[in-house]
């Protein structure tokens, strides 16, 4: 029966008006003819031909889900959570305790009186914090190419070398390189994979996982000030750096647990590379392949998403004054209240409240759908700015405790919800690039904040103006970020209005067998 049909088809003359010849033409040929007639609506025909509806969760433009990948939501993921907790805690515990290191560095240079010493010493900690974020776009490329495990292990080892060599430095110039550059860059390569790897093991409970990681790391922010003030400081600055380097050596070992579940070679969609760009044919020239590889690792596709651009700009604006209290707090307390011997308690308070905030807001973030999570960051940044302005108004030490408890809660909310928002805006396949570019945009303002505050202190003789001005950027950034969910909602409404109104009619015709001549109703449906 098939051979007869084939013979008739082969013997038929194109353009023949013999009805018997028309009946003997194969269904495939008639379908191809019909498809050519419907060329302007080619994508719709392909949808009907597959006979199935797309039931994948909606993703932002340019974001691809990765062939229905479902994270395990636990299991070995909790080991990864522990390793990520140590990573976040050791890095940001050291950074948040830099106020004590700052005082030790200033004391080390007291024999060389310099009116701008606060400005120069502040650059040591600011460089380290800035490099963590400045290197993030490069870290994204390394993470995509080499994976989370190799990137994090190498980064932690570089940070270990930076802290160890800092113990032998004797000048600010050397500390700029060993602590600011080496430790900062190594921390960046160790830190960012710890954010990305959580998305490989959690999705529904990603906010909780981030909350556990960041809350556990707050224990370091609480314990390290006590360790530095009561135990390490009497040993001197060199021993301090040597002891801190042990934390990063342990991190290099724990990072071996960062086993990715989304391999770099997996393509999320047919014909697409991992980053969402078009795949390069085998016959392409060497130049084209080179350009394709460059486009992959310097992928700026995330910036085509308007909501991501607004969010990234708002966060980068807000962090200009974010790190100022951590660096200059202890010197401010010493000038405002004298030698109270209790100033280190403020770092413990901000670490403890930040841990509570990360657990609390991590769970709350899982309950808030979609991009509306950004409203949590909006509130935290605005309150953070107001609290920064309140610091000079505190006439008693207990007032500072209240202010820094609230600032810790805001810090916990901002840190915990950052990765889930990135996943919501760009999807899991581009989350690494999105986080990397965001942290890179944060680098310059976060680095510039503490030295500017030190310069204002040297000019005015106190920290009042510095803390007042440090509160302005978080408020402005929060206002900018407020519009992200509104823009997202407007874009969704516009996409619904521009949907093809004839789709329902075409599906109805298809169900009657009209769309595919030569096929039965059941065959058309299949």
Curated annotation (Swiss-Prot):
Signal sequence, renumbered to the chain: none
Catalytic activity: 3,3',5-triiodo-L-thyronine(out) = 3,3',5-triiodo-L-thyronine(in); L-thyroxine(out) = L-thyroxine(in); 3,3',5'-triiodo-L-thyronine(out) = 3,3',5'-triiodo-L-thyronine(in); 3,3'-diiodo-L-thyronine(out) = 3,3'-diiodo-L-thyronine(in)
Membrane topology recorded in Swiss-Prot or TrEMBL: Multi-pass membrane protein
Record-level GO BP terms: brain development; central nervous system development; chordate embryonic development; locomotion; neuron differentiation; oligodendrocyte differentiation; optomotor response; regulation of thyroid hormone generation
Any GO molecular function: thyroid hormone binding
Localization in the cell: Cell membrane
Extracellular side: 95-121, 178, 229-242, 331-343, 456-466
Ranges annotated as biased composition (Low complexity): 16-28
Tissue occurrence: Preferentially expressed in the adult brain, gills, pancreas, liver, pituitary, heart, kidney and gut. Widely expressed in the nervous system. Expressed in the vascular system and in neurons.
Disulphide-bonded residues: none
InterPro entries: MFS, MFS_dom, MFS_trans_sf, Proton-linked_MCT
PANTHER family: MONOCARBOXYLATE TRANSPORTER, MONOCARBOXYLATE TRANSPORTER 8
Family statement drawn from the similarity comment of this UniProt entry: Belongs to the major facilitator superfamily. Monocarboxylate porter (TC 2.A.1.13) family.
General function of this protein: Specific thyroid hormone transmembrane transporter, that mediates both uptake and efflux of thyroid hormones across the cell membrane independently of pH or a Na(+) gradient. The substrate preference is 3,3-diiodothyronine (3,3'-T2) and T3 and to a lesser extentd T4 and rT3. Acts as a crucial regulator during embryonic development.
The protein's name: Monocarboxylate transporter 8
Taxonomy of the source species: Eukaryota, Metazoa, Chordata, Craniata, Vertebrata
């Amino acid at each position: 029966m098939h051979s007869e049909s084939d013979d008739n088809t082969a013997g038929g003359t194109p353009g023949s008006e013999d009805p018997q010849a028309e009946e003997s033409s194969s269904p495939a040929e008639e379908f191809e003819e019909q498809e050519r007639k419907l060329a302007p609506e080619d994508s719709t025909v392909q949808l009907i031909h597959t006979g199935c509806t797309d039931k994948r969760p909606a993703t932002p433009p340019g974001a691809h889900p990765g062939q229905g990948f479902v994270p395990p939501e636990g299991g070995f993921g909790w080991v990864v959570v522990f390793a990520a907790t140590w990573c976040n805690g050791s890095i940001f515990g050291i950074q948040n305790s830099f106020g004590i290191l700052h005082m030790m560095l200033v004391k080390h240079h007291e024999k060389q009186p310099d009116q701008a010493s606060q400005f120069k010493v502040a650059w040591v900690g600011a460089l380290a914090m800035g490099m963590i974020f400045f290197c993030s776009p490069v870290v994204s490329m390394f993470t995509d190419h080499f994976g989370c495990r190799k990137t994090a292990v190498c980064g932690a080892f570089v940070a270990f070398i930076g802290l160890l060599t800092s113990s032998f430095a004797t000048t600010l110039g050397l500390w700029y390189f060993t602590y600011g550059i080496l430790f900062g860059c190594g921390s960046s390569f160790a830190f960012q994979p710890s954010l990305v790897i959580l998305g490989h093991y959690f999705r529904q409970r990603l906010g909780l996982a981030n909350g556990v990681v960041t809350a556990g790391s707050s224990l370091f922010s609480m314990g390290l000030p006590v360790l530095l003030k009561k135990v390490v400081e009497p040993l001197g600055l060199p021993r301090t750096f040597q002891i801190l380097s042990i934390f990063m050596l342990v991190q290099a070992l724990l990072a071996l647990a960062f086993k990715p579940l989304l391999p770099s070679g997996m393509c999320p969609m047919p014909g697409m590379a991992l980053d969402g760009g078009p795949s390069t044919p085998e016959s392409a020239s060497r130049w084209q392949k080179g350009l394709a590889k460059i486009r992959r690792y310097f992928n700026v596709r995330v910036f085509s998403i308007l909501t991501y651009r607004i969010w990234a700009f708002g966060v980068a604006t807000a962090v200009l004054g974010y790190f100022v209290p951590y660096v200059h707090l202890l010197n401010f307390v010493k000038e405002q209240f004298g030698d109270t011997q209790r100033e280190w308690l403020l770092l413990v308070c901000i670490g403890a409240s930040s841990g509570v905030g990360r657990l609390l807001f991590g769970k709350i973030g899982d309950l808030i759908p979609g991009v509306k999570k950004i409203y949590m960051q909006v509130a935290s940044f605005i309150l953070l700015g107001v609290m920064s302005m309140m610091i000079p108004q505190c006439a008693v030490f207990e007032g500072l405790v209240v202010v820094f408890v609230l600032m810790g809660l805001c810090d916990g909310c901002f840190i915990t919800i950052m990765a889930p928002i990135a996943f919501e805006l760009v999807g899991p396949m581009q989350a690494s690039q999105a986080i990397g570019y965001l942290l890179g945009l944060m680098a310059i303002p976060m680095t510039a904040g503490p030295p500017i505050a030190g310069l204002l202190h040297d000019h005015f003789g106190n920290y009042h103006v510095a803390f007042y001005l440090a509160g302005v950027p978080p408020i402005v950034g929060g206002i900018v970020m407020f519009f992200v969910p509104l823009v997202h909602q407007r874009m969704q409404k516009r996409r619904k209005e521009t949907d093809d109104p004839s789709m329902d009619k075409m599906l109805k015709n298809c169900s009657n067998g009209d769309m595919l001549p030569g096929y039965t109703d059941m065959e058309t449906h299949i």
